[in-house]
Amino acid sequence: MRRTTRRALVNVVLFSTVLFLILYLNRPQPKNKKFAWNEIRYKPSSATLPEARGVCPGLAGSSKPALVVSRVAADGEQIWLDALAKLYHLCVYTVDAPTDKKSKHLQVPANRGHEAMTYLTFMIDNYDHIPAAGAVFIHGARFQWHNDEPNYDNSVLLAALNVTSALKTWGYHNLRCDWSVSTCPASAAPQGSLETSFQAVLVPWDDRAASDAALPKVLAELFGAIGGNEKASSKNGGGVRLGTTDAVRAQCCAQFVVARERILQHSRDEYVALRQWILEGSRSDLVSGRILSYVWHILFLKPGEFHRKNSESAAYEGIDLEQLNTRACPRAEECYCRLYGRCNLERCAAGSCYGQYRLPPDLKLPKDWADTHE
């Protein structure tokens, strides 16, 4: 065989092999895939755990929903929260404040993981006193680009929020209704896809790409069996790692309302383990915080809605991913009505309603926005 012919044959074989692998990895997956994401199984490596310093004063016995606020000093004055005290029991954590070793109140063990550190610390240190009315989890600045309100004003959203209606069906609801910058649209690439992996490599400074690409492995770390086995036992209902064509559809930006029962369906130790994953990990705050923004709805959406069970044995069969995605991304028109009483809106698509929200340029508000819109 001539050398040029041999070289051409080798190239054909290599090309065919690569093409086969690409097609195989991206082959259609069966519907109704189930995942054993019912319990946090991560095992912390640290022998010592942080002291409890995140107690919210006066929470025990409160008849109002808790408003859990994760803020930094740069968020500015928090006086805007005072007007909400009639509706909520305020639990405000300033995560970059110096530690007060004499106090057990409203402190976090470290400024890591963005809002997730505050949220988990609240659940851990107030586990026995979550209000019957539920809890709302938000960021500390009043005006933020992702607040789903024409003026991006969280005080308006929270004053209008109907907590009872929001929790009635599923026991959990993200505070955003518009789908922009979420993974709700079908056009958003699956987190484990080759497209996402390539994007993370080609644009390493893109935190969204980095967190999306890391999600399959992280879900295996958090929900996997003891010893890091990514194949959960049959009693846990399937695997824990996303395939290349499996997409977790989730709303942006880690502000949500959740019922007490949904928080208590997981043990306090699970929240401790999840917080330790942040404290012990090496990922950047943006990446770890964004990854957990994909996890909240997995933890809290009402189990009966998508935790499939065998009709004969009632054995646990895992979370149905398709149903989970549907619950995580309700139509915008339904969402605005359910959460904020903005009903019968016109010119609505699946993920937006005209005039309700507009994505600001570069995901930023003008520097003088707060001064001109208070």
What positions do the PLM features span?
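ER/Golgi luminal nucleotide-sugar-dependent glycosyltransferases, focusing on the catalytic module
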Residues: 2-374
